[in-house]
């Protein structure tokens, strides 16, 4: 998901870890607090793609710091930075998401 969609993707994964093969979070963050599946995720460690611009003008430093701490402890994190994108998505990021989904979601055929 993008922005709030990324928050939703990770929040739903945190609520029902067994139902997710992977998650994508572009220019987003993880919600604060403890979710029912957080402990289980430390064992399952599903793949999560997190793409962003380090200078994103919308997502605050606290949310970025929380996400940077939480994701590596609860997932197989693939983290990418896209300088100059701002709070948006670039062609390079979409290409990286395509590769990530192709490698991590069995049977997935994302539209390219």
Language-model features, listed with the residues they occupy:
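Primarily recognizes the serine-hydrolase "nucleophile elbow" in alpha/beta-hydrolase
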Residues: 1-43
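Residues at the starts of beta-strands that form the adenosine-phosphate
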Residues: 21-22, 47, 76-78
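Short beta-strand/loop motif that positions the catalytic acidic residue
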Residues: 44, 49-52, 56
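Acidic catalytic loop of the alpha/beta-hydrolase fold
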Residues: 32, 54-59, 86-88
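Alpha/beta-hydrolase-fold catalytic nucleophile elbow
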Residues: 24-27, 51, 83
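Short, hinge-like loop/turn segments at secondary-structure boundaries
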Residues: 40-44, 96-99
């Amino acid at each position: 998901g993008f922005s709030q969609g990324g928050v939703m993707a990770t929040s739903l994964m945190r609520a029902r870890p067994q139902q997710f093969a992977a998650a994508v979070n572009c220019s987003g963050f993880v919600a604060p607090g403890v979710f029912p599946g957080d402990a289980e995720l430390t064992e399952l460690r599903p793949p999560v793609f997190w793409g962003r611009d380090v200078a994103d003008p919308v997502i605050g430093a606290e949310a970025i710091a929380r996400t940077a701490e939480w994701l590596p402890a609860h997932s197989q994190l693939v983290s990418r930075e896209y300088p100059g994108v701002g709070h948006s998505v670039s062609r390079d990021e979409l290409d990286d998401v395509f590769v990530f989904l192709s490698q991590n979601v069995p049977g997935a055929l994302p539209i390219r």
